[in-house]
Amino acid sequence: MHPFTRKLSFGCAMLLPFAFSLSPVLNAQNTQDDGPPNVLVTQREYLKPGKGGMLHERSESAFVRAFANAKSNSHYFALDSLSGPTRSLFVMGYNNFADWEKDRASIINDKVLNAAVDHAAEMDGDLLSSYDSVAMMLRPDLSLNKGSINGTRYFEITTFVVKPGHRHDFDQLAHMYADAYKKVAPDTHWDCFEVMYGNPAPGFPSGATFVVINTMKSQAETDKGMADFEKFSKELGTSGMEKMEELTAASIETTGTNLFQINPRMSNPPQEWIDKEPAFWKVPPTSMTKETALKTANQ
């Protein structure tokens, strides 16, 4: 658990988790060699009770095969929830919003791929209770350091809704965290994104919204984060912690944190990811038998 997030668990007033090493993590369509994408698009599938696990993997395998057969340059990776509602996230990264538009057009204009995706979506829809998407923009000024997708297995995602008229307080709070962590835990990394389109999560109020994700190789990093937070508190001292609590109370309307795990079987990663971690990414998608496919289609 990242230090910012941990404050939520301890019931403190300070509600600002900040950690996200998206670097090549979300560079599926990003041409940058390093660093997070400028635009992050996430599609969320909320599953009906009992419709997750291998059943959902089999359904998603149709999408993976469709993109592979088309030799499409569209790439994404999947995350399965380990907390909160049962859901899967499908994550795509772009250099800009124009590239997002081009990627959508490439699918629509490929009649064979478009038909295969439509068919897969129809079958997959029987497993879903709802579906939505959100598009976000990178905020480098609220981010710290860079990480790597290599070895990453978990995503800790935190959403913040900022009170109207208090964006400056939120920015100040984020910078205070960054300045302190540079001193006590210089290996700390995070990337922050601001929501441009869509709601961050069902039930969240509207307003300026920021999404922060901590990528982890293992959950042992949660334990390390707790130790780092003790150093962080000592660095700030009583007056610094009080100032942070004031800024938190002034700027944050609501926040929530959830944990997700990468699912390579439902992912369509770029080749460079596979080359670096073939044992993890190069796994066959869960196949759907003809009997299962017919059963799903007829539900």
Name the predicted role of every residue range.
Residues 11-23:
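Bacterial N-terminal signal peptides
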Residues 27-299:
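Short S/T/G/P-rich N-terminal loop/turn motif that feeds into the first structured element of a domain
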